[in-house]
Amino acid sequence: MNSQQSTRTKQMLQQSSTHLLCGVVLLQLFAAQVDAQRSTSPWQTLSGDAPLVIARGGFSGLFPDSSLAAYQFAMVVSVADVVLWCDVQLTKDGHGICFPDLNLANASNSEEVYPNRQKSYPVNGVTTKGWFPIDFSLTELQKVLFSLIRGILSRSGKFDENGYSISTVQNVATQMKPALFWLNVQHDEFYEQHNLSMSSFLLSTSRTVSIDFISSPEVNFFRKIAGGFGNNGPSFVFQFMGKEDFEPTTNRTYGSILSNLSFVKTFASGILVPKSYILPLDDKQYLLPHTSLVQDAHKAGLKLYASGFANDVDIAYNYSWDPVSEYLSFVDNGNFSVDGMLSDFPLTASASVDCFSHIGRNATKQVDFLVISKNGASGEYPGCTKLAYEKAIKDGSDVIDCPVQMSSDGIPFCSSSIDLVNSTTVGQTHLRNRSIIVPEISSVAGIFTFSLTWHEIQSLTPAISNPFRENGMSRNPNERNSGNLISLYEFLNLAKNSTSLSGILISLENVVYLREKKGLDVVKVVLNRLTETGYIVGTLKVMIQSTTRLVLVDFKNQSTYKTVYKIKETIGNITDSAIEDIKKFANAVVINKASVFPNSDSFLTGQTTNVLERLQKFQLPVYVELFQNEFVSQPFDFFADETVEINAYIFGAGINGTITEFPYTAARYKRNRCLGREEVPPYMLPVNPGGVLTLISTSSLPPAQDPNPIFTHDDVTEPPLPPVIAKSPTSTLGTPSTIAKPLRNFLKVIRIVSWSVAGVVLFLVLLTLVFCFHRKRETRLRQQKLKALIPLEHYTYAQVKRITKSFAEVVGRGGFGIVYKGTLSDGRVVAVKVLKDTKGNGEDFINEVATMSRTSHLNIVSLLGFCSEGSKRAIIYEFLENGSLDKFILGKTSVNMDWTALYRIALGVAHGLEYLHHSCKTRIVHFDIKPQNVLLDDSFCPKVSDFGLAKLCEKKESILSMLDTRGTIGYIAPEMISRVYGNVSHKSDVYSYGMLVLEIIGARNKEKANQACASNTSSMYFPEWVYRDLESCKSGRHIEDGINSEEDELAKKMTLVGLWCIQPSPVDRPAMNRVVEMMEGSLEALEVPPRPVLQQIPISNLHESSILSEDVSVYTEG
């Protein structure tokens, strides 16, 4: 920054604390500030001008909404005519403040400062609790301890301790001096009911403040202020809410008003609508065809502004988590352009309008670097499939990559992982029994490529990677299993036939293991394939990448292909000797993003790392990985915008190439017109690493971290490659060279054979005797071990027969055995579950029983004994007269339970699961929670039973390694079906519990549920019906007719808990201890969960490849 800018900044520091903050912003985040240059491209707006960028509450995507810091930052990083948006609220003494919500608690610390000032008021006909500005004076709201905080909890809370104060409308206008100022009045009628006049405030404010826009969702408000501002007054914009919501002053729905835009034109010059009014989404979050609303508004002479833009919220899957693509779809689609966009991230909106609009795929490139795909366009299709590679080529990749793996029969192919579980649905197929642990590769069991033939691999279904599934972010679910894996030969031909690619990158890992253990020479195979497909001479550059130095040396010695050395570790520096060594065998280097910009707690630290500079000094190009569009992959410094991140690494750091799962985003950046200007606008200047941290209060700073290690010559040194082992030859039958033999040789052979036969017979007799002795001894020792291990009665199989009177009375059947009624010698009636005959030594069964024998809880069925005799196994537990829960909720008994009884049962089951998950010495995950496995005693106290599918795990283990699918269809958690849904853990039981609770609710409302589902020709998803029924209760009606308020509260609480438990992503589900708190807490404390999404479960595959429990009662009598 030049001396004049530094002087100007110092002056700002002396003016006020607010200007101090903004001066730091200017110093730390951006290298310069220049006026944006408007594009001269034609626009399809009403005026023909570029769409307005409207900053909602300033830059509210980073700073607390409506803080002076948010407003000034928006002005610094946006287009010159950015519109500052202020949601106007009135204090009890009539002052207008900028605050985003009628309830102060939603974006301030009012609850902490004024804990006893909560009140209830009717707002649009709904009684609402909160802290309202009409109960506070401006002085009270501007006291030192009162401050603004984030209103959206998923955003960083680091700025909550900065003490940003509430500002008046006049304060924002005079301090910020915005080019355009927009005041939004959301609740005029509410203030009028409390003797506060919003219209009077605005009219008096307009005498000292320049107001350019006034918006409101209330028709009468515009009638009151009509004519009050004169001919040169602000533009009036009518704001539309949800189409089914009622406009409070006309009692008409906004949807009905939308159909009469000529009526709106009588009092407004523009309309503000949610973006879904223009580009609606289907139930799966995909775009539907655009509506004609923009064209209709323009025909009526109305400008149309769109709201709801934010980089860190869910957007249509069509945009591939790229916010720039979303903005462009509203302003540059060839059909229409909105007149403005209301955004929490005005920097991205500014860049979209000014830098990326109206540029085609063939536009001039403003910057040169390599766009290298990662497993093709693997952010949009399953990686390494033909579809992913074709998409990567179409999207503008310069280089496509193939991570080479080897099949057992020596066929090289492209796959993102040597473990097929990570990239396909092999775990759901009959091939899951190929699972092994290879310590040289991973400590986790997997199904490795070298264990399957190429024919078997070709039969597998690929699976899209979902690295942020636990954050609730999925990738293109419609295509999650599309495409087919391709061989290296097919990959090479696909690339060769492309006219746009400049090269290919082939990555090789695990080469040493494959040579030494499997006899597979990957280097030789790859070289042969390259030769066969004509890559010896050609225009495409071939790059060979590996983390193993000697693999690259081997290629160097046998070919002229370029080699790329990948440094796996995150490093903070690199020595000259290490670089000199690398340069001997590599032409380029790959490092990760943190080796360029270190970060801590999702913020760039600003620590100096000169790794990139040092490598480039030795003439080594540096490619950086991994670039992903999902905002959770990026530090907060990049404002949840992948384009900002790419800009920092290309324009800021100067890397030579990006390795990305979303090639389109990186390729589009090359055509960024703003980079070709003499003065680059502020929204395209690279952020300065560590700049955002300087704006955070000391108390909220992340802990200091040790510097990343230095990469030295020793890190490059490796032992020599082992020789390729010879594969075992296939045995063949030989043919004697002659048939004629001397007679004596024939007799000699006869004698040898005779003695050999006799010896074999004697050996077998001795072996049988030893085996019998050993087996008896082993059985005796095993019985002694069992008695010491399990503190339960150990019954013989003969005793089990006597207890059950030779299995006379069947009381239930399950997927793993039959339940009989029996009587012990002391007269106690018991249930005896006899498991189906099993092979093996039964260690899993013994471990399960041993652990369960040490459990004791009111809501867990009590084990009384067991039998383990050879393949005969049985469990003996208490007999419960009322049988299983399903009888009562499915109407198989005359007993009709009320909501209180059902609530107690649901709560009891929750307590039981909480005990299994959080109170046992070793956590037990049940995996088969359903009404049939909940038994009821004579007091209807529930007890969780049937642990046939249970799995034990240490409490510290949050993720379970499983290759089979366990449970009952309808209750199985999505992550049990495929890893693309998330990881299997104790949260899988939470999902099953949620379905159990919802089934209880559905049973109580059976007639209503049947009517709703029958009326939907697409067979309504059951949780969807529950959710809709819950929504209909917001109006005040009970969730079931004929019940009292207490029962209605219990029913609604169960509904909310059930819906939270069945969230598709495990991370969004509460743990069972939290479920118990929710069930026992107040209804008011529960938030409404997101709407459940229908998951299509491949049932046919489940039956083929899973451990499924039959959906039958544990007890059929009682």
Curated annotation (Swiss-Prot):
Superkingdom of source: Eukaryota
Chain sites annotated for binding ATP: V811, G812, R813, G814, G815, F816, G817, I818, V819, K833
Keywords: ATP-binding, Cell membrane, Glycerol metabolism, Glycoprotein, Hydrolase, Immunity, Innate immunity, Kinase, Membrane, Nucleotide-binding, Plant defense, Receptor, Serine/threonine-protein kinase, Signal, Transferase, Transmembrane, Transmembrane helix
Chief location of this protein within or outside the cell: membrane
Domain Protein kinase: 805-1094
UniProt keyword annotation of Isomerase present: no
GO cellular component: mitochondrion; plasma membrane
Catalytic residues identified in the record: D928 (proton acceptor)
Tissue occurrence: Expressed in shoots, rosette and cauline leaves, stems, flowers and siliques.
Comment, domains: The two glycerophosphodiester phosphodiesterase domains are predicted to be extracellular and the kinase domain cytoplasmic.
Protein name: Protein SUPPRESSOR OF NPR1-1 CONSTITUTIVE 4
Organism: Arabidopsis thaliana (Mouse-ear cress)
